């Protein structure tokens, strides 16, 4: 019987596994990089072992260090979580060779299925050996791991070499394996997957289907179970194929078989030999704890001959610290507060006061709703996200709400091209003038408490804020009866609560301020200085860091004075395990190069300057 478990992972999945272990009376041990010294998963574990360093290659991808940590902590078993080494057969063998229990499939099954190239061969499919114009578009894909890393869509042959190079680097950074392959890219299909669970006694369960079609950068954003709109025949066919794939490699534990469904035809994508991020929707529908089932299977227990019956519908949304309107750029900073209403499940990797850094995935949490019908579950999740309190970096919360309420999603007609078609509309955020006014009035109340006054009280005060990247101006007045503004009756105003009445309708606004960061209900504003200070102007052609991150590469031979072509890649940044290429904005000469490989950069930092000849 397992009495103690080390989780070879971090963040949300480590916290989630620890929760089940605590419920079962199992002692928990975390591993934590120096960047994660005070992370939530390190705080909630019974014990923590340090992994010296910050980047994944030095820490969470060092299987040797993790095995040493497990032995030093005296645990019985190792759970890999997802990502990092979760689909690394060598790591699984090292755990077993150390005399520990591996909570996952046999190394041989991982070798057969975790490598996408091997899995496709097993399923009778071959990757492309040579790409021609007729093959386009194609998808460059990491052979190991998942989560959208190491993937590039190529629509022009001249882009293939760059896509291969970028995918290899990203895959090596995320999974410790730079192998990639190329396959045909199916446009606008639906991403459907089947959850399986197998024991050591020959029983394999297919736990229904999931739809994970809403994706950005090939990484899932919203998932649900069961997949809506499938014929009973197709749903059964997919589950039968998944069971056959598991039996073909003597699979044990949880796994996911993924398909792309287009025009009623299913195309095998891959098998993930690990727990998936989206496993909670299956848990909700089947009334299971899949982590508990993993532990039971690892202890040798047999599954029942048949799985439990599915009940209702579940939908999950991934809350990311990112700006969808700015090329999904990762965001950093302090997460001041994160709460969701009762009635939904929150799986979080961060708690109030945690710092969101640049080294790891930007996912803050997953929010899951379960209800008798799909429509009820979707409504419940959208409402919970709308009422959630999320104070801190910019997030994708608004995008999630609008996606869930979009007619294409509510009618279950979505596919993997959803955000290609609708991102611009979904990220267009019309300003709410009353929310902006509430921010200004709350600020005015705070200032008045500390002696703020004017010689001309009848003159309007002006405050300026940015909302979704746009600047807005707000005017209000101090009167003998208190604060006032045109077109609205100020019922109440203090530092944290403003009540306004507009045309007989009262609205309450909860306000919180952290420095220049202002949150009014679920809107995030930035307060601008009352008296703007002049700033140095950037030279034309300046290339600024679009996000905080690490410079991983400078174009070969690039020095000050080099001639460059418009669109030519110059600097490669890595943030939260994703690479971003900074290209020349025009044809000309490089007049400044301010960074070197390995350097940490902040948002807006000057990287280089390109000027026309």
Each predicted region: which residue ranges?
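N-terminal beta-alpha lobe that positions the nucleotide/phosphoryl donor
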Residues: 1-257, 261-278
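Short amphipathic alpha-helical segments
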Residues: 149-150, 223-226, 361-367, 541
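Short, well-ordered beta-strand elements within core beta-sheets of diverse protein domains
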Residues: 151-153, 184, 230, 363-372, ...
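Short acidic-glycine loop/turn motifs at beta-strand connectors
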Residues: 156, 198-203, 261-264, 371, ...
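Residue-level recognition of beta-strand microenvironments
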Residues: 185, 349, 370, 493, ...
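Catalytic cores of soluble metabolic enzymes centered on carboxylation/carboxyl-transfer
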Residues: 242, 280-283, 288-486, 566-569, ...
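Catalytic P-loop NTP-binding/switch module of NTPases
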Residues: 506-546
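Structured functional modules or segments
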Residues: 534-613
């Amino acid at each position: 019987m397992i009495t103690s478990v080390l989780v070879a992972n971090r963040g949300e999945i480590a916290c989630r596994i620890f929760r089940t272990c605590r419920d079962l009376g199992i002692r928990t041990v975390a591993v934590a990089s120096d960047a994660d010294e005070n992370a939530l998963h390190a705080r909630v574990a019974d014990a923590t072992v340090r992994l010296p360093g910050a980047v994944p290659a030095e820490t969470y991808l060092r299987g040797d260090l993790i095995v040493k940590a497990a032995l030093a902590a005296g645990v019985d078993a190792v759970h890999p979580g997802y990502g990092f080494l979760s689909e690394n057969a060598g790591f699984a063998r090292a755990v077993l060779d150390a005399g520990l229990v591996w909570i996952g499939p046999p190394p041989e099954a991982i070798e057969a299925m975790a490598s996408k190239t091997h899995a496709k061969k097993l399923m009778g499919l071959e990757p492309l050996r040579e790409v021609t114009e007729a093959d386009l578009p194609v998808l460059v894909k990491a052979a190991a791991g998942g989560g959208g890393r190491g993937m590039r869509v190529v629509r022009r042959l001249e882009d293939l070499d760059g896509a291969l190079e970028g995918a290899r680097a990203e895959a090596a950074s995320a999974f410790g394996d730079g192998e990639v392959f190329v396959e045909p890219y199916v446009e606008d299909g639906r991403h459907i997957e089947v959850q399986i669970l197998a024991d050591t006694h020959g029983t394999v369960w297919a736990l229904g289907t999931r739809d994970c079609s809403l994706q950005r950068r090939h990484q899932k954003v919203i998932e649900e179970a069961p997949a809506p709109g499938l014929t009973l025949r197709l749903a059964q066919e997919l589950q039968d194929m998944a069971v056959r794939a598991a039996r073909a490699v003597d699979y044990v534990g949880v796994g996911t078989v993924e398909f792309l469904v287009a025009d009623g035809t299913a195309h095998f994508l891959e098998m993930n030999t690990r727990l998936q991020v989206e496993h909670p929707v299956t848990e909700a529908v089947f009334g299971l704890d899949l982590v508990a089932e993993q532990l039971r299977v690892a202890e040798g227990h047999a599954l029942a001959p048949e799985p439990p019956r599915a009940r209702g519908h579940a939908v999950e949304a991934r809350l990311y610290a990112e700006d969808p309107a700015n090329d999904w750029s990762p965001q950093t900073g302090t997460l001041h507060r994160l709460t969701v209403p009762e009635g939904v499940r929150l799986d979080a990797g961060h708690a109030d006061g945690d710092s969101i850094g640049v080294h790891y995935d930007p996912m803050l949490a997953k929010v899951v709703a379960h209800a008798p019908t799909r429509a009820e579950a979707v409504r419940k999740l959208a409402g919970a996200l709308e009422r959630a309190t999320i104070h801190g970096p910019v997030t994708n919360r608004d995008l999630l709400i609008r996606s869930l309420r979009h007619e294409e999603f509510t009618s279950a007609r979505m596919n993997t091209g959803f955000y290609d078609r609708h991102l611009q509309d979904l990220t267009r955020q019309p300003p709410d003038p009353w929310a902006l006014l509430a921010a200004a009035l709350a600020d005015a109340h705070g200032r008045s408490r500390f002696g703020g006054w004017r010689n001309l009280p009848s003159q309007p005060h002006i405050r300026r804020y940015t909302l979704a990247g746009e600047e807005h101006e707000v005017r209000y007045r101090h009167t003998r009866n208190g604060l006032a503004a045109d077109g609205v009756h100020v019922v109440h105003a203090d530092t944290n609560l403003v009540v306004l009445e507009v045309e007989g309708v009262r609205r309450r606004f909860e306000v919180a301020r952290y420095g220049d960061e202002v949150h009014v209900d679920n809107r995030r504003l930035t307060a601008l200085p009352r008296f703007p200070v002049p700033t140095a102007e950037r030279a034309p052609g300046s290339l600024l860091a679009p996000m905080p991150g690490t410079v991983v590469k400078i174009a070969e031979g690039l020095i000050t004075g080099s001639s460059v072509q418009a669109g030519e890649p110059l600097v490669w940044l890595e943030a939260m395990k994703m690479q971003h290429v900074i290209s020349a904005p025009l044809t000309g000469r490089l007049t400044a190069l301010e960074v070197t490989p390995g350097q940490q950069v902040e948002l807006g930092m000057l990287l280089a300057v390109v000027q026309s000849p």
